[in-house]
């Protein structure tokens, strides 16, 4: 049923790599981001507007969690607290 093929013929590929994968020189290893709120055991609060400034862009937009590394639970809470701080005029809606 199966042909008897020696291991050298099975492992050799046409591209010259034994494992069959081409090496990508542009590949970069990214460190997984961790949630700052989970690490420090703190909850986002609108009164800490200096800390909340780290999570908004220069234009005043809320940064997504794939960039900040926050968990889904804390990202939802963070968005609410930023909106509260904007309403209380602690953070600007739009930066000029």
Swiss-Prot record:
Q: Where are the transmembrane segments?
A: none
Gene Ontology cellular component list: cytosolic small ribosomal subunit
Signal peptide stretch = none
Q: Does the keyword Glycoprotein apply?
A: no
Sequence segments annotated as region (Disordered)? 1-25
Q: Which InterPro entries does the entry link to?
A: Ribosomal_bS18 (IPR001648), Ribosomal_bS18_CS (IPR018275), Ribosomal_bS18_sf (IPR036870)
Query: What residue spans carry the Basic and acidic residues bias annotation?
Result: 1-22
GO terms assigned for molecular function: small ribosomal subunit rRNA binding; structural constituent of ribosome
The record's subunit annotation is: Part of the 30S ribosomal subunit. Forms a tight heterodimer with protein bS6.
Q: Which function does this protein serve?
A: Binds as a heterodimer with protein bS6 to the central domain of the 16S rRNA, where it helps stabilize the platform of the 30S subunit.
Tell me the protein family, please. Belongs to the bacterial ribosomal protein bS18 family.
**What name does UniProt use for this protein?**
Small ribosomal subunit protein bS18
Q: Which organism is it from?
A: Borrelia hermsii (strain HS1 / DAH)
Gene behind the chain: rpsR
